[in-house]
Design a protein with these regions (language model features):
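N-terminal export signals
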Residues: 6-27
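Short helix-initiation/N-cap motifs at beta->coil->alpha
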Residues: 46, 110-122, 256-265
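Structural recognition of the beta-strand scaffold that forms the well-ordered cores
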Residues: 61-63, 82-84, 134-137, 159-161, ...
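Solvent-exposed loop/turn segments at secondary-structure junctions
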Residues: 66-69, 87-90, 133-134, 139-143, ...
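Pocket-lining segment of extracytoplasmic ligand-binding domains
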Residues: 252-266, 272-297
Length: 388
């Protein structure tokens, strides 16, 4: 994640929510706000908008981050959900969709109010469902400003949360908003503390390392198109690019003008990456040789697909190929309060001795089992070519 600010430097939005970010005397700096479960609730969302919720919401539309919503709220929070962005959820996050709908079959009966993987919102459908609260992401908010005004005039409280920017303060604020909104402060706080303390420890260990071991050249690519085409890479402001920036890896796409775009084969080869990372998921598209990772994906299948990328034409002389510094990661697991485990994993990839005690994949699965025991979290989330 990009931000390295401590809790004492968090935005006023955190204080306005009235939750304790850290120990070490932070409690004394917080305003005297109502306890959880008391209303009205007044706070500032990630778009710095003051939001007032006058009574406990009973009807909620979740237009983004349903996995985070359930991690914080637990299975009981699903009873409040009257609308979801269901369009293309199954085709763009197939593994996640299968796991969550198997555990909670009722999800499939919840009306769809737009696209899971785009910013399209169906205003008429939202109004017809009469929600008390609409939870949306930042890009949805930006793309639907006029619709948001219409919805708020109709009495719907719109709350903007964000896990895309990979900023610690947004992850924490969004999770605490969910915890307070759903009466699950303890669960939200536990997830936040794991994230905050985990990233702080990662930063501490990396800062103690000599500069000579940092900034190894790295190429990260989303493998949804298969080895025959080059998928997106990310600059330092978003997703994997932000993670690589944080751990001081030398991403060859770090300074790209666009947040995400595909690099050419010639450029990748010319930069001779020492480490290659392929992002996978389970996309329901026609690219049968796509990189598959995440929920429900068997390890041998993921490894075979990763080897397909390693065997690309003209890649045989890349340093990463020669030294087997070739890895797979689950793209679908990003944009979540638990995605700091991928920062930990990549820190271990780049600095194995400094993180030899870390077991991020096992810890990620354990977190799912602890906070959402109804789902089956088995799958392949982090992978090295050396396992083959």
């Amino acid at each position: 994640m990009i931000s390295r600010r401590t809790v004492l430097q968090f935005s006023g939005a955190l204080s306005a929510l009235g939750l304790i970010p850290f120990a070490h005397g932070a409690e004394a700096q917080l305003p005297d706000l109502p306890l959880a479960g008391t209303w009205p609730l007044v706070f500032t969302d990630v778009e710095s908008r003051k939001v007032t919720i006058r009574e406990e919401p009973k009807r909620i539309i979740v237009a983004n981050y349903i996995a985070n919503y359930l991690l914080v709220g637990g299975s009981g929070a699903l009873q409040k959900v009257v609308g979801l962005t269901q369009d293309h959820w199954e085709s763009t996050r197939t593994g996640e969709y299968r796991v969550f709908t198997k555990a909670f079959p009722g999800i499939t009966q919840i009306p769809s109010i737009g696209g899971y993987h785009d910013d399209i919102l169906n205003t008429e459908r939202i109004l017809s469902l009469k929600p008390d609260v609409l939870l949306i992401g930042r890009t949805q908010f930006a793309a639907n400003s006029q619709r948001v005004n219409l919805l708020e005039r109709a009495g719907i409280r719109v709350i903007v949360i964000d896990y895309h920017a990979m900023k610690l303060e947004n992850h924490v604020l969004s999770t605490r908003i969910l915890g307070r909104l759903l009466g699950r402060d303890d669960a939200g706080e536990a997830l936040c503390r794991e994230c905050i303390e985990g990233l702080s420890e990662i930063d501490r260990r990396i800062s103690a390392l000599p500069s000579s071991v940092k900034h190894r050249t790295c190429y990260m690519e989303l493998g949804n198109l298969g080895p025959g085409q080059y998928g997106n890479s990310y600059n330092a402001t978003i997703l994997w690019g932000a993670i690589l920036k944080r751990i001081e890896a030398g991403s060859i796409s770090e300074k790209n003008a666009e947040p995400y775009s595909a690099l050419t084969r010639e450029f990748v080869i010319s930069r001779a990456p020492e480490v290659v990372i392929i992002g996978g998921s389970l996309w329901g598209n026609d690219h049968a040789d796509q990189m598959r990772m995440g929920f429900t994906v068997e390890r041998p299948d993921a490894l075979k697909r990763l080897q397909g990328f390693r065997n690309r034409p003209l890649w045989q002389n890349l340093p990463a190929v020669k030294t087997n510094e070739f890895y797979g990661v689950d793209h679908g697991s990003l944009r979540s309060i638990v995605d700091w485990r991928f920062t930990q994993y990549l820190a271990k990839v780049f600095y194995p001795e400094a993180f030899k005690d870390a077991e991020p994949e096992a810890a990620l699965v354990a977190t799912y089992r602890r906070h959402l025991p109804e789902i089956d979290p088995r799958g392949t989330f982090m992978l090295s070519i050396r396992e083959g």
